[in-house]
């Protein structure tokens, strides 16, 4: 029995059995960020400080200890204030230190400032210089020991083992065709394993006793000779430091520093755990350096592999890859800063007088501050947050990247790393990843996954005992899961929790198989546990091809928040949690009653009488220029509970994600206007603001100090009429609420002009009239081409107010323009199933195809977009949406619903359409007989005639994507040129031209359009003198002169000459007597503009033409 949940006017119907709905609630979706940062503050920072303590000077007289406790001061600015002032939301760190003078026994204790640490906001982001940033989680190879099987040149199996620490030298053991064991330290030359083991001070007996097959290693001892400890150390030194005289102490020191010094070598907690697990050791977790026991056990496992005992490792298995989140990445950065700090402290201890030293004079916060700043400002993993809509924000915080420092690079990453691995099940989404060069390197955390203390991804399972679910939930990592028989989340279960299916499909050791219910160990908690949040918002996901689902998941993140958000008629039940965890909606922290509601804030009185205020965001600009605005959804007097939603954010409605609009669709061709993914829409979507969005843009101008005096922000602008200044106030800054078009002045600014800046006629006037006219140049901030909008905010920053300005600036003015963008031809719209298209025509309502009751459809999609792309989910969604619209209800359909009956989606849609037909009483709503089941006869709006055959009609959820034609359309008449090649720049931002590339040249060559081609490659591009003369000729109405030499050709010649190749151009001149001579042409000559003005033009090139360049 479906349960009805009422929200607003439309009842919600959850379709699917109560046992399999996500009744197991999702975890907090931003937990990965917050938990990691909390760990850093509670443990990570202290751990790093203590690892550097004590710092002693070179003589050993002074010692500086860092103590356990550190303090954080209150942040200087709040989050909102930091955003407004363009500063960083951070706290100051103070740490207790103790300076001990060993000679006098004097002890000084002091709290020392060690730097500023950016604080995470409660939404899991950081505010750096006023911009919200996210630290992306990195997925890297875990430290530990890895065994690999390789074939040598003769095709014989050999094995090797790599011992990878968290930081320090790599150790590689390998066997060869002669059954000898070798070792490499940090990819240097091969060294016999005997040498290393003897250098560690082990005797023959200790070595051979550690092995299961000592006879195998005996060969290496016999072949390589038996070394004493001293000889082994000398040999080791020779191999690692060739060319230096070897000494025993040198060898000893080399070994110590490489593997046994905690400062230089660290396995990390994870490395030690993995090593103990793989080699079955019981070394304590606090021992983070190598022990002889580790090395012996590694070699023993390697030898056992030769006897088919044990197994090689799969490095793409998630048991061997771990996640480094904010906390750990930050900790590594702090270590870098402390390393630099340690050197400075040592030097200061040595240089200064011992009596005058205090901890504060020793510790300089600069290196630590610089390291942290560098990480947040320029690391590949610190990214400008994607704030297009709440889902984009949420997904960005849950992203997993294999790129970045210590990770892979795009070029080196092969196919295996990018591919889906069986261990991704329930941990990394197999669907959501970018298209293009980063495919497979950037992923998204699955809905229920979490990261454990070692950094491995875990996923929850329900425990099964004797074929019955016990209700207990257990999180398993990828390598733990391999040992159990695990059934999928859509297994049929009865009321008592007994598994009904027999046999059950299970996964065991990365293979699919069958088992009886009694053999099953675990069942997945939910069918959507394998996909990410964005993917889980796609209804009928199981009916879509994975490639299209990928596009659907990625495009939801690009949906622009619309003016009036509307929830989907067909959802999946996760919209509420996605909106809540994105942080865009306001959630009550207490139980209580609403005492005040306005557009600015909401106040709640708790049960103890205390009032809490929740301020609302209004028309703020997001990182992507979309609009962030919150609307209250409660009224005064309402009782609210802790966790209830008080206000909607952008792209949410009723506390649920609402990225698009439900619109009436017909799948049919229409006059070729929806050929190749083009889309035909009705005027209604424009006039009723169905797809209208608000965009807020920021414009900024600085008044700087120049050599000739300060720039001034003023209303007094030379050569500008009063009409252009009508929207400026007395300071010369635009007033809030003014409507601005392209070219209007936002902020008036004048710059002092030097003598050299003046044209000669002005100098002449000056000389005659002797008056010093105001020597300033207009440098105002104007609205750029193609932009218009209303001024919603103006902010002025000056030093007097205490704002931090960039060096050299006296004043910064920032103007925010908001514009309403209606949907128009060229905009990109998409559904949730990867069905995307560009709007090709907007038809009047009366011309659109209409239904039997006279309703015109809103959008016409091409039916050919469905079969070959195999995203049939959109058809199910359309039909169920049609039923929902007729019945006035909304549906929540969990994906993967076939556990109780085959083709469950089809039965559900059929059942609901039958119900819709009964409720409306219109037989045409659903025809379930005849040839055209589920299709509706539509009529041509232009003629009123019925179309050839019935078509599929229904409600589909479409989104307008951020690729708006307004931001892309661009034209250039004249504009800037590149300095080197003298060709026009590219791109809208640079006012660039259209690139006429190699293939376009082929096209003109194929048509033999020689003159057009010559013009394109010369005067329209980089023939410098030619283009000026051509412009001159056009202006004066004369014939266009003949093109000269393109600049890029000269650059090519110069480059060849710089390589030492003598490249010159010659032409053959025919004399009057018929003889010819060879003349060298200087291509560079016309740089000085000495080109003869009377050069032949196209029209006066008469007679026998000689293909030659005129001489200058």
From Swiss-Prot:
Pfam families: RNA_pol_Rpb2_1, RNA_pol_Rpb2_2, RNA_pol_Rpb2_3, RNA_pol_Rpb2_45, RNA_pol_Rpb2_6, RNA_pol_Rpb2_7. Signal peptide: none annotated. It comes from the Bacteria. It catalyses: RNA(n) + a ribonucleoside 5'-triphosphate = RNA(n+1) + diphosphate. In cyanobacteria the RNAP catalytic core is composed of 2 alpha, 1 beta, 1 beta', 1 gamma and 1 omega subunit. When a sigma factor is associated with the core the holoenzyme is formed, which can initiate transcription. NCBIfam families: PRK00405.1 (NF001616), rpoB (TIGR02013). Belongs to the RNA polymerase beta chain family. This is DNA-directed RNA polymerase subunit beta. It comes from Gloeobacter violaceus (strain ATCC 29082 / PCC 7421). The gene is rpoB.
């Amino acid at each position: 029995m479906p349960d009805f949940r009422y929200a607003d006017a439309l009842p919600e119907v959850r379709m699917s059995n109560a046992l399999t709905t996500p009744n197991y609630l999702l975890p907090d979706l931003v937990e990965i960020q917050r938990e990691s940062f909390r760990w850093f503050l509670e443990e990570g920072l202290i751990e790093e400080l203590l690892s550097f303590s004590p710092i002693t000077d070179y003589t050993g007289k002074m010692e500086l200890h860092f103590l356990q406790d550190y303090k954080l001061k209150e942040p200087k600015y709040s989050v909102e204030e930091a955003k407004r002032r363009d500063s960083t939301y951070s706290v100051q760190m103070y740490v207790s230190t103790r300076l001990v003078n060993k000679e006098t026994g004097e002890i000084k204790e002091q709290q020392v400032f060690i730097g500023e640490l950016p604080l995470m906001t409660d939404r899991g982001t950081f505010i750096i210089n006023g911009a919200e940033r996210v630290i992306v989680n990195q997925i890297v190879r875990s430290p530990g020991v890895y065994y690999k099987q390789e074939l040598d040149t003769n095709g014989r199996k050999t094995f090797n083992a790599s011992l990878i620490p968290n930081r320090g030298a790599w150790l590689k053991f390998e066997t060869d065709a002669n059954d000898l064991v070798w070792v490499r330290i940090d990819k240097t030359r091969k060294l016999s394993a005997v040498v290393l083991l003897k250098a560690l001070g082990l005797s023959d007996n200790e070595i051979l006793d550690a092995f299961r097959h000592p006879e195998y290693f005996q060969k290496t001892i016999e072949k390589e000779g038996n070394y004493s400890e001293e000889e082994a150390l000398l040999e080791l030194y020779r191999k690692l430091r060739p060319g230096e005289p070897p000494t025993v102490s040198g060898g000893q020191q080399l070994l110590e520093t490489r593997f046994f010094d905690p400062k230089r070598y660290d396995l990390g907690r994870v490395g030690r755990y993995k090593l103990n697990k793989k080699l079955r050791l019981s070394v304590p977790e606090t021992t983070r350096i190598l022990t002889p026991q580790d090395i012996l056990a590694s070699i023993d496992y390697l030898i056992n592999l030769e006897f088919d005992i044990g197994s090689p490792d799969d490095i793409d298995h998630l048991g061997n890859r771990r996640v480094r989140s904010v906390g750990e990445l930050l900790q590594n950065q702090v270590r870098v800063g402390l390393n630099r700090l340690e050197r400075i402290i040592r030097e200061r201890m040595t240089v200064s007088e011992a009596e005058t030293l205090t901890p504060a004079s020793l510790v300089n916060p600069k290196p630590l501050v610089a390291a942290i700043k560098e990480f947040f400002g320029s690391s590949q993993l610190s990214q400008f947050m994607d704030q297009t809509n709440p889902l984009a924000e949420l997904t960005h915080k849950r992203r997993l990247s294999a790129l970045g420092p210590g990770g892979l690079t795009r070029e080196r990453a092969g196919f295996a790393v990018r591919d889906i691995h069986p261990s991704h099940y329930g941990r990394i989404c197999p669907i959501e990843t970018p298209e293009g060069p980063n495919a497979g390197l950037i992923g998204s955390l699955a809905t229920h996954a979490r990261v454990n203390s070692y950094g491995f991804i875990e996923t929850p399972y329900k425990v099964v005992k004797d074929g019955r679910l016990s209700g207990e939930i257990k999180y398993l990592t990828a390598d733990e899961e391999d040992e159990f028989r695990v059934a999928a989340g859509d297994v049929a279960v009865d009321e008592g929790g007994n598994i009904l299916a027999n046999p059950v499909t299970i996964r065991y050791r990365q293979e699919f198989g069958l088992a009886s219910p009694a053999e099953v160990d675990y069942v997945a908690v939910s069918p959507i546990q394998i996909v990410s949040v964005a993917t889980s918002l796609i209804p009928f996901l199981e009916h879509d091809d994975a490639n299209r689902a990928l596009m659907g998941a990625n495009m939801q993140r690009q949906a622009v928040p619309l003016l009036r958000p509307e929830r989907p008629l067909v959802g999946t039940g996760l919209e509420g949690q996605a909106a809540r965890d994105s942080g865009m909606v306001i959630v009550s922290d207490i139980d209580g009653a609403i005492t005040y509601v306005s557009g600015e804030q909401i106040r709640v009185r708790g049960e103890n009488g205390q009032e809490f205020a929740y301020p609302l965001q209004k028309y703020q600009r997001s990182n992507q220029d979309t609009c962030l605005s919150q609307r209250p959804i409660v009224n005064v007097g309402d009782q609210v509970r802790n966790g209830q939603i008080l206000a909607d954010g952008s792209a949410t409605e009723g506390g649920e994600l609402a990225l698009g609009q439900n619109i009436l669709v017909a799948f049919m061709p229409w006059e070729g206007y929806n050929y190749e993914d083009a889309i035909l829409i009705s005027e209604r979507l424009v006039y009723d603001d169905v797809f209208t969005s608000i965009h807020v843009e920021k414009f900024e101008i600085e008044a700087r100090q120049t050599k000739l005096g300060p720039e001034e922000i003023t209303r007094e602008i030379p050569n500008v009429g009063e009409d252009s200044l009508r929207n400026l106030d007395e300071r010369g800054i635009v007033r809030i609420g003014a409507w601005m078009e392209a070219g209007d002045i936002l902020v008036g600014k004048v710059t002092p002009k030097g003598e050299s800046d003046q044209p000669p006629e002005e100098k002449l006037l000056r000389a005659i009239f002797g008056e010093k006219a105001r020597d300033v140049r207009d440098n105002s901030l104007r609205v750029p081409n193609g932009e218009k909008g209303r001024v919603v905010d103006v902010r002025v920053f000056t030093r007097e107010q205490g704002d931090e300005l960039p060096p050299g600036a006296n004043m910064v003015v920032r103007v925010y323009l908001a514009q309403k963008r209606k949907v128009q031809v060229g905009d990109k719209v998409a559904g949730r199933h990867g069905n995307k298209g560009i709007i090709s025509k907007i038809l009047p309502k009366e011309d659109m195809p209409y239904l039997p009751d006279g309703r015109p459809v809103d959008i016409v999609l091409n039916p050919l977009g469905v079969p070959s792309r195999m995203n049939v989910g959109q058809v199910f969604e359309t039909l169920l949406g049609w039923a929902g619209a007729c019945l006035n209800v909304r549906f929540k359909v969990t994906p993967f619903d076939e556990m109780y009956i085959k083709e469950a989606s089809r039965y559900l849609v059929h059942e609901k359409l039958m119900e819709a037909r009964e409720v409306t009483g219109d037989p045409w709503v659903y025809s379930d007989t005849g040839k055209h089941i589920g299709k509706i006869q539509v009529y041509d709006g232009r003629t009123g005639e019925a179309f050839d055959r019935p078509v599929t009609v229904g409600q589909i959820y479409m989104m307008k994507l951020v690729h708006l034609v307004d931001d892309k359309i661009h034209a250039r008449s004249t504009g800037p040129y590149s300095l080197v090649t003298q060709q026009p720049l590219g791109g809208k931002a640079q006012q660039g031209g259209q690139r006429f590339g190699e293939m376009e040249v082929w096209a003109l060559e194929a048509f033999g359009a020689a003159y057009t081609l010559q013009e394109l490659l010369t005067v329209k591009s980089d023939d410098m003198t030619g283009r000026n003369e051509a412009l001159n000729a056009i202006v004066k109405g004369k014939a266009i002169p003949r093109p000269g030499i393109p600049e890029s050709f000269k650059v090519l010649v110069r480059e060849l000459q710089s390589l030492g190749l003598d490249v010159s151009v010659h032409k053959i001149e025919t004399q009057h007597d018929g003889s010819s001579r060879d003349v060298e042409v200087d291509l560079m000559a016309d740089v000085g503009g000495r080109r003869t003005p009377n050069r032949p033009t196209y029209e006066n090139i008469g007679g026998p033409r000689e293909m030659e360049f005129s001489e200058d």
